[in-house]
Amino acid sequence: MSIKSDRWIRRMSEQHGMIEPFEAGQVKQANGERIVSYGTSSYGYDVRCSREFKVFTNINSTIVDPKHFDSGSFVDITADECIIPPNSFALARTVEYFRIPRDTLVVCLGKSTYARCGIIVNVTPLEPEWEGHVTLEFSNTTPLPARIYANEGVAQMLFFQAAADDICETSYRDRGGKYQGQTGVTLPRT
């Protein structure tokens, strides 16, 4: 698999709707102020998180169980920024909707601006023929509250394309993946 450049990302997004909405360059300012950048970079695409957040709370003192997840463990917030409590996490979703080609795998890495503040972004790889808004998990590893900004860059997507003779036999769509076509912040499913 080879990593794909800005030219490929632009072409696939503009001609095939791989990323919508799509920003062909890097956006570093909004309303005359510097922001955490988003858009196309040399070998990736920096995504934004939407204004939709789910902040984890221990109000119910439950056990976190991915097979029997209690949605009451979250507080829903719609805002331009989100405060994550110390040693806790929040879920959000990308502004961008993705349609991944059958010969492509996408890996997500956190942006260094957040990582240097102790905020870690975790996302499972976007598999071939998956589509939807990406649910993002932000871990605040610090003993202090941490702030996330909506509509600014939060993570970078790296695109890897398989050789023509090595395309997967079964894609995410073929398997009927449980997160196919997700919109909004999506909680764990089994």
Swiss-Prot record:
It comes from the Bacteria. Pfam families: DCD. It catalyses: dCTP + H2O + H(+) = dUTP + NH4(+). CDD domains: trimeric_dUTPase (cd07557). The active site is at residue 137. It is an enzyme of class 3 (hydrolase). Keywords: Hydrolase, Nucleotide metabolism, Nucleotide-binding. Pathway: Pyrimidine metabolism; dUMP biosynthesis; dUMP from dCTP (dUTP route): step 1/2. The keyword Cell inner membrane does not apply. InterPro entries: dCTP_deaminase (IPR011962), dUTPase-like_sf (IPR036157), dUTPase_trimeric (IPR033704). DCTP binds at residues 111-116, 135-137, 156, 172, 182. GO terms for biological process: dUMP biosynthetic process; dUTP biosynthetic process; nucleobase-containing small molecule interconversion. GO terms for molecular function: dCTP deaminase activity; nucleotide binding. Its EC number is 3.5.4.13. HAMAP family: dCTP_deaminase. Belongs to the dCTP deaminase family. Catalyzes the deamination of dCTP to dUTP. Homotrimer. This is dCTP deaminase. It comes from Stenotrophomonas maltophilia (strain K279a). The gene is dcd.
